[in-house]
């Protein structure tokens, strides 16, 4: 009896297998072909666009990491023969190393940070604040409207526009004076007028009500403030 049931089971299994084989998709047939062509194209383009956007973001962020040779280079100030200046302490704070790297893109700004004879207040946004911007610091919506989304930053002229935008971003976060007193209106290197007020134990920069996380460093030529968001630079 058991042997008979086993034989019947084997026969049934073989029969079902042959049916499934006959219903198999022909070689080379893709389930993707069952989708309407227009939908396939849209999904494909969205996937490629997503990859491009992600790659662009990762590439941009990787370029903003501080140059290791600059970050750890020794000078007479590092050895204690001179007091440190803002340019010495700025790249050492990992929370703001994106902004620190941007300041090194422009020789006049870097020189000012390194000048012990001229006081300065650096308002450095945290990395997370820059990363959460709706657009890159070098992007300007007006450029896209005037030159188009594709060619706004292509070629030498496009690169120059991007560099100018980036410089404005950095200059909007630097005040050529220190100390900066509460309620005192000061003009940034970019020409914007700012002041700060204190609410409880928190400091807020106006306009924009930008919260100061902390005053990280006080050195011979000024102070380094860390911000929880970016200042208006347009």
From Swiss-Prot:
InterPro entries: FAS1_dom_sf, FAS1_domain, Mug57-like. Keywords: Signal, Vacuole. PROSITE patterns: FAS1. The keyword 4Fe-4S does not apply. Pfam families: Fasciclin. The keyword Methyltransferase does not apply. Residues 83-231 form the FAS1 domain. This is FAS1 domain-containing protein AFUA_8G05360. It comes from Aspergillus fumigatus (strain ATCC MYA-4609 / CBS 101355 / FGSC A1100 / Af293).
């Amino acid at each position: 009896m058991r042997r008979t049931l086993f034989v019947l089971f084997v026969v049934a299994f073989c029969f079902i297998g042959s049916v499934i084989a006959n219903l198999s998709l022909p070689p080379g047939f893709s389930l993707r072909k069952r989708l309407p062509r227009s939908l396939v194209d849209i999904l494909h383009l969205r996937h490629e666009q997503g990859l491009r956007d992600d790659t662009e973001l990762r590439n941009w962020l990787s370029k903003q990491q501080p140059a290791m040779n600059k970050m750890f280079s020794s000078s007479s100030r590092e050895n204690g023969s001179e007091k440190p200046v803002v340019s010495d302490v700025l790249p050492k704070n990992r929370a703001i190393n994106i902004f620190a790297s941007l300041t090194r893109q422009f020789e006049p700004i870097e020189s000012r940070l390194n000048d012990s004879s001229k006081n300065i207040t650096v308002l450095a946004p945290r990395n997370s604040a820059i990363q959460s911007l709706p657009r890159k610091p070098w992007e300007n919506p007006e450029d896209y409207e005037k030159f188009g989304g594709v060619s706004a930053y292509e070629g030498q002229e496009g690169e120059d526009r991007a560099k100018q935008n980036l410089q404005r971003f950095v200059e909007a976060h630097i005040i050529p004076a220190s100390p900066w007193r509460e309620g005192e209106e000061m003009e940034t290197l970019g020409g914007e007028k700012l002041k700060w007020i204190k609410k409880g134990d928190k400091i807020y920069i106006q306009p924009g009500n930008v919260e100061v996380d902390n005053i990280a460093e006080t050195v011979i030529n000024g102070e380094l403030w860390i911000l929880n968001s970016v200042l208006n630079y347009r």
